[in-house]
Amino acid sequence: MGKDRQPRGQQRQGDAAGPDDPGPKKGAGTREQRGEEEAQTCCGCRFPLLLALLQLALGVAVTVVGFLMASVSSSLLVRATPYWAGIIVCVVAYLGLFMLCVSYQVDERTCIQFSMKLLYFVLSALGLVVCVLAVAFAAHHYSLLTHLTCENAPDSCQCKLPSSEPLSRTFVYRDVTDCTSITGTFQVFLLVQMVLNLVCGLVCLVACFVMWKHRYQVFYVGVRMCPLSASEGQQQKV
């Protein structure tokens, strides 16, 4: 009796204004969007972008070491100096940087985005195969050098397999003044190439997995099932 009562009109206006107030809903939506954007980034960068940067750094390193190996002797084969593997990985990295920095979206909305993601996936797979080949060639050449006996010759280095080998051959490395550049420096370059190409192949494999996961493993089953469960609950109540 002693309490003041508001008129019924004011109470109805207050009740009607509550559900229509867009303030808290907008704030919650922006917070959810910010959370999703932060989940897709790592230190301010998207996770696939970090993979592309690693591809670029490793590709440049493989290319530089490959050209240094080619400068040791002019008679080295192309497969023995895998600068070509680094060039291919650099091309893949440039495409990935362009795609991830300009217009990257998890769900493809245009044919250009789908084509770029597919091309990046295919080139990353190609980079993986090329890196594996480079590792195989470097390992074969390294194991061969461990069995060779090298001797200095005029403007060259002649290396021979032991006479006990059934296929005894003589390998001539031209434009070499000292055989230590073959048995020492060149062997170190081969080891470095094996490590770099192995790591580069793993990065290309992870890039392929990330592209495949974003394409085929992005499901929104919970968002779709919640309205269905809510509607079923309403039907049961009725």
Curated annotation (Swiss-Prot):
One of its GO terms (cellular component) is postsynaptic membrane. The keyword Membrane applies. Residues 1-33 are annotated as: Disordered. Its main location: membrane. Residues 8-20 have a biased composition (Low complexity). Residues 70-81, 103-117, 210-238 are cytoplasmic. It is a multi-pass membrane protein. Signal peptide: none annotated. This is Sarcospan. It comes from Oryctolagus cuniculus (Rabbit). The gene is SSPN.
